[in-house]
Amino acid sequence: MGRKFQRMTDVDILAIAAHRDDVELTCGGTLIKSARKGRATAIIDLTAGETGTRGSAELRGRESDEASKILGVIERVNLGLPDAGLTNTPETRALLALEIRRLRPRVVIAPPLEGRHPDHIVAAQLIRDACFVAGLAKIVPGVPAFRPSKILHALAFREDYVKPTFVVDISDVFEEKLRAIQCYGSQFDNAVQAGEVYPTGEPLYDVVRHQSAHYGSLIRTRFGEPFYTTETMRVDDIATLEVNTF
């Protein structure tokens, strides 16, 4: 069921995704950077990836253990929901809501609400719904209700969706992000596409580098990871806004 580092009561950032390796591809740099700043980070993988074309669920589990060490997360959980058959039901919402209550994250990172892979689309809405359900005291009343403050959608490789609300500068941790992705050799070695990564004819690792460089260029840095939030962002002092117009 994935690598369990320790039991805990609160995390700052919880990344939730459909498959092992999704987090590494879309927001791995942000998790690494956050952990280095002293933030408590964790991951929930909704499925074990048992129907994937390459590798096996067992092998991907071992690969995720190695990647988790690089990401610096303090806990990684696998819910064991059906791969390629993920559903958003009262039962799956309650199961995920229980983990959200246990981990008590301030911020949750989810996939985009639109995507190429059916599991990713279902996962995005399932995560939003489970975060809401986690705050309803009468659902699984034996566990204290809790609701995260913020949901962010990781937008990497989804340029056909919406413009990012913001981009995290991952220039100083990009090589570590790439090493975490490379832990999934069964999925990515000699691959040219995966999940939301469209094929360009280049090796997948090169596509990740080029895409990260593109997002970094939007904020005038070397590498970046894009995010979208349904809420308008607050600014207290416009004189401190970064990213020059010229």
Question: Each predicted region: which residue ranges?
Answer:
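Metal-dependent de-N-acetylase/amidase catalytic core
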Residues: G2-L14, P90-F246
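Active-site rim/loop-helix segments in enzyme catalytic domains that contact anionic ligands
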Residues: M1-L103, T240-V243
